[in-house]
Amino acid sequence: VKTRSVLESVSPYNPPRLREEISVDHGSERYVKLTMNELSFGPLPEARAAIVETLSRAGRYPDRDATPLREAIARANPGLSPDNVVVGNGSSETLVDLMQILERPGEVVIPWPSFPFYVSAARVVGLNARKVTLDGHHRVDLDAMLAAVTDETRAIIVCNPNNPSGTYLPLAEVRRFAEALPEGVLVILDEAYYDFVDDPAYAGSHGLVLQSENVVSTRTFSKVHGLAGFRVGYGLAPRRLADLVWSTHVPFSVNQAGQAAAAASMGQPEAIAGRSRLMKRERERVQDAFGAAGLEYVPSHTNFVMVGAKPRLFEKTGVLVREGEALGYPVGWSRVTIGGPEENDRLLAALG
């Protein structure tokens, strides 16, 4: 069988493996999993009810166009219409769909450390990934990314807030950056952690999408909405780019339970904002404890924190965290998901 030789050197995205047991003396309690930036609360009650309601239709294909969901997303982003919204099996699929529409060969410029999936996704669709190091404050370095643009550049991904550093860029900086780029370069704003940032200077990227021909935003229902297991993400894009994405998109990739749950969750903005506030309080508690223990950490605006400690430190109280080297950070760093209050109590018990 003739296959694409480039795939021989592509490593698949490798999320942390689940461990049913860890070698620590922690009685009969199960471990606490704080590795993947999930929300321990799960779906809102309205989303749960919507999921149950779809069971009677489980033998039918879902709405290919996800029309009610796209309408709900458009309503939440004033000025955009459902024609500006694409959906995917998680925002990861939307990222791949966006890369699929780009001319090849070419490059995608990405920040680093950042979401490792960018590298494998680019390679799989036939693009190279050029990494640009974060600045001294662990932020995406827009000046350095602009300097990295060449005639081969097809897209630039700005993870904002950035995973795994947890830092963000104000919208004004992103706007200036996008305006300075050649028109033929696509700007992909990966905003998976959008809902956790409460700074007014951050919000409003949908307006930038509306005013541009080369800016798109991707978001997900896997984080603050608590729907990671249902795999629903979306993109906001100029109409021409949205149409191209639909032309490459795998039909029916977003199941009907996920569509219904996501639409129901979008209809509860106050509840979602309340979850974000709780995460902020818990994040500040965790960061304060890290500081009091003398641990270096990166001040975060998301539901995770990068801390200068090895995962083994937290395993002694039955807590699993993500090793930093898997995400581009040096050995000796960990990314810690902010859990619920009781989970964070277990996490902080490791500090003594």
Language model features with spans:
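Active-site pre-lysine segment of PLP-dependent enzymes
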Residues: 123, 130, 140-152, 164-187, ...
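Conserved PLP-binding catalytic core of the aspartate aminotransferase-like
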Residues: 279-280, 284-318, 324, 334
